[in-house]
């Protein structure tokens, strides 16, 4: 995690070593990796050493890809190197009015292009969920966001050697696994060129209340 109250959450050489150690432990033990991102990027006072720390983090992101689940929770304004790592993780959670992701902030954009843009227009949660496609989940509050992270973990295996988790669902009698859904016969059209609502198919096939939709 990154603490914005300490040097704006910027990455120093020592801070990068701490993050890399946690990532190594997650890989060694086959445990999901959850990052709480709230950082302004590299600590410019340390120069190249800080940038080298990002290289070490990115390397571990790629080594962990497909091995353990990697989840990024963006809970503040993140810029520069602080957004490259989340962008190559498996899932990104953002909060409206709180989370921002951009390579450079609005002030730099104004200086270079003379165009005025707000934080939300440049890298807000809705922009990344609806336009860039970077964010997978968007919520209106931090507690709701963190609760959703816990919900997602219930659907994921611990690592690539672990089986998919299963759980008992206390649904109504109408939600029996042996039920027949006659509506499926009419819902899916005969023509492969005719569209239909996939959400309705999923709701009929899956256990009630078990559908978790990702962007």
Describe the residue ranges of each PLM region:
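Non-catalytic terminal/interface segments that mediate subunit docking, oligomerization
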Residues: 1, 23, 27, 193-215
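A structural preference for short, pocket-lining loop segments at secondary-structure junctions
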Residues: 1-3, 18-44, 215
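Flexible beta-alpha connector loops of hexameric P-loop NTPases
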Residues: 5-14, 45-51
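Short charge-dense sequence patches
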Residues: 8, 95-105, 200-210
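Conserved catalytic cores of soluble enzyme domains
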Residues: 37-161
């Amino acid at each position: 995690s990154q603490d914005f109250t300490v040097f704006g959450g910027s990455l120093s050489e020592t801070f990068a070593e701490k993050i890399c150690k946690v990532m190594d432990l997650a890989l060694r033990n086959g445990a999901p990796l959850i990052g709480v991102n709230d950082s302004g990027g590299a600590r410019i006072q340390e120069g190249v050493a800080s940038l080298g720390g990002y290289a070490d983090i990115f390397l571990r992101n790629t080594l962990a890809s497909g091995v353990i689940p990697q989840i990024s929770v963006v809970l503040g304004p993140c810029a520069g190197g602080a957004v490259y790592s989340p962008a190559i993780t498996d899932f990104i959670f953002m909060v409206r009015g709180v989370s921002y992701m951009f390579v450079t902030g609005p002030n730099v954009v104004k200086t270079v292009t003379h165009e005025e843009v707000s934080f939300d227009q440049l890298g807000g949660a809705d922009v990344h969920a609806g336009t860039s496609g970077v964010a997978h989940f968007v919520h209106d509050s931090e507690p709701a966001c963190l609760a959703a992270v816990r919900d997602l973990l219930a659907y994921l295996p611990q690592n690539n050697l672990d089986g998919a988790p299963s759980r008992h669902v206390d649904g109504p009698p109408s939600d029996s696994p042996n039920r027949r859904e006659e509506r499926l016969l009419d819902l899916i059209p005969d023509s492969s060129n005719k569209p239909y609502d996939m959400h309705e198919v999923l709701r009929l096939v899956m256990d009630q209340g078990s559908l978790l939709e990702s962007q």
